[in-house]
């Protein structure tokens, strides 16, 4: 196994589950690398809508996991392989990779280093930057699982993507186009509409002000074939009235309220968990063409935050933004390691206010 160059690292870790006040910048040991794992020097980590759920202990309860503290957050990440386990053959130190680290027992990607099972790691596909790749994994896999496994999307089918300017949605638009579908997208705000048009959707409406059902019927006069729903509520259910009889609807587990399509339409929740075959298929789609007029696959980054501003990144999850938020891990690490205030928690009070 190639040797790592340092024994400790900076990480955003929890000593208990709870609110923002539990997130502290700590100095922790660099995780040991198992035989079927790789050690990634993390450059970027995605900040997802599910991260507060994990921070509050939701995933530990959901999966029946006994948590080990300090608990490092971060389900998405990208960087460079620093070391590989003895049984790893397909990847090597120096490879640029992205990784899934959801409820990883050795810690997530809100850290300088992460040890992750090789089955959950892939070389970065296409022309994606490390920043884009670090923001992408869970949302891209969730979009892909919905389109491919759950909906069985076919070329020339019409699809409604509700929440098309969000993390999952803006990636689903591009994947659906690469699968040959006709995409009717519902975005949030004029900026969201502009983004989704740029990403190649065939038609885009603003979910806050447009008549979605009327526009959908104009787009697909015989009714929409399928729908991928990433946000629930009255507007979603009204949009689903434009589905054809026998249509198919999918939504990731956790979408609330759950969508309620008309009778006669199949509606399934699903999980977006990765496996090596799905990761390979996702990579091939990313590297393929999205059709005439479409550019390279894009992971839209709304804002980036340095590692020691992870709390601000979590606060930003409740604001209006397009695409994804990220933490820049490999950012001025000398400052993080030398600043004496970092020996103490980032927060002094229970209200999460900076010291």
Show which residues each predicted segment covers:
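C-terminal hydrophobic helical "lid"/dimerization subdomain
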Residues: 2-7, 279-355
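Glycine-rich beta-strand-centered segment in the early N-terminal region that forms part
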Residues: 29-47, 59-103
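NAD(P)H dinucleotide-binding glycine-rich loop of Rossmann-like/cofactor-binding domains
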Residues: 66-68, 75, 90, 100-163
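Short glycine-centered segments of the SAM/dcSAM-binding site in methyltransferase folds
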Residues: 96, 158, 247-248
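Mid-domain Rossmann-like dinucleotide-binding core that forms the NAD(H)/NADP(H) cofactor-binding site
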Residues: 134-209
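Glycine-rich cofactor phosphate-binding loops and adjacent beta1-alpha1 units
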Residues: 194, 199, 203-268, 354-355
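Glycine-rich phosphate-binding loop and adjacent beta-alpha segment
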Residues: 231-296, 329-342, 347
